[in-house]
Amino acid sequence: MNYNNQTIHKKQCVMNELQQALDKIHSADTLIIGASNGLSISEGIHIFGSNQDFYDHFGDFAQKFGFNNIIRGCFYPFAPENYWAYFARLYHYMNIKRPVTAVMNDLYQLVQDKNYFVVTSNFDNHFRLAGFDENRLFEIEGVGKDLECQTCQSVFDGTDILTQLAQIENGEIVTSDIPKCQECGGELKIHVQLDEHFVFDKTWQQKRHAYQDILAQGKHGNTVLLELGVGIRNQLIKQPFMQYTYQNPNAFYISVNKGDLWIPDEIANRSVGINGDLASVIHDWATR
């Protein structure tokens, strides 16, 4: 009996936290969304996972090169032909094999009428595919559909190129298939920050300024920082979000993650932490 009472109390606390967070989202003048790997995992994309899904889609690369998850493949020192075979496969996986799910659709439904902005370290392109406004989306470490030239510092949409490469049978790309920069003919890479040569082009700079602008704007109103699937050691999103909340008395911080939550005492009275399944939490909010 006592166990049942404790269970009921725990469920009630969770429901109260969900409602408090939703009320804050609804009343926000400005909503800043920060998303990382946990959100991708909720959609079935686990770049750190050494799981059956990885071997089903990248097993030939695993067998040939010895890595056991997507992210290790991203850092592998491939020969150029294998590099493009891998990243074309990864593009196809993230955009076609693992399309946008109800998680992103629910999130968009929840926030579409708000003054929102998204900052994310995910490079799967799913915010864009779900309909989020391009001008209110800052993919801080790039996106796997774009290509960059480190010679002339240009960045452009690589959708057509990656789609064509992904269709080459067995991923057997040859030297003549390797794309070149449309501006200078230089060597291309995927526009994802994997080393110190990442191209911070004009569009990236504009997105950064837009992010800074909405943070400044948020200081003058009721601002909610909604953090989705961000680990406690994240320096790109979590630390700035917590610091912003600490420095701005009108800010409220919401962190949703499964089994990986931390809220400092200094902002605890203006925060809610929800330890739960992202898909379930977002669906609950979108359908209340």
Give residue spans per PLM region:
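Conserved catalytic alpha/beta core of Sir2/sirtuin-type deacylases, generalized to analogous enzyme cores
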Residues: 2-288
